[in-house]
Amino acid sequence: WTDAALYSLQFIGPPNTFGLTLVNEGVSLIGPNAAINSPTGVYWMDKKGFYTYNGSVVPLPCSVHSFVFDDLNSEQAFQVFGFLNKQFNEVGWFYCAAGSLTVSKYVVFNYVEQTWAIGELSRTAWLDEGIVAFPRAAGYADGNNYIYSHETGHDDDGVPMDNVFIESADFDIGDGEEFQFIRRFIPDVKFTGDSGSTQTLNVVLKARDFPGQSLTTDQTTAFTASTTKIDTRARARQAAVRFESDDDADTGARLGVGFVIGATRLDLQPNGRR
């Protein structure tokens, strides 16, 4: 990479003869460690977007583009680094948010499902599984440096993981033309933690009538392994669903909780345009 183009370096012949070929102009690399190789090609973060190369350069459509690049400390772009999480078909990048001098956020792309996710986490280096059984990452917290083992365990330090959540982007209910009455919804949740049938999380339904409005919380419901459905009486054009840790529960009940989210189904009924 240069500041304005991508080149390919190929071996031509002995003893040490290589050829430099222009691959694509108008692309760059935001930082020296912002490229990552994956089973489906090379991915990298540019100063204004994301790209992949598998014989040709292809821009990646990104549904969270504004979230990342409108909140990026460009003066700390050299700290951006890419990572591979092969177990979950993901590549991603850690970066410094606006106003932060250290890495504080990440963006992830699933190259099989073609979906994006965002989050907040402080990591400074990443080694995917292979040499070790699980991914390892370096991080800094409370004045100390740590090596974290990822994708294993839930709260190995004996402290519950509070403020944990997965939240969807807001989506149109139906086509968004008419109001829809949400009678109930059926979350697809699999609890994977160590505390068995006592595991609980909160399911939050948010809604709004018009795109320019803020999402408001319509309902928060506790969800366990025995919960089959959640009845509601929400009316809106757009909605979002959030799954979060039950931080109000006793400490013992919050330990060993883990969950995986599938596709949530909504029971809808048209409810007019006004």
What does each of the following model-derived ranges do?
Residues 1-24:
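Surface-exposed extracellular loop regions of Gram-negative outer-membrane beta-barrel proteins
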Residues 26-41, 47-274:
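Beta-sheet repeat architectures centered on beta-propellers
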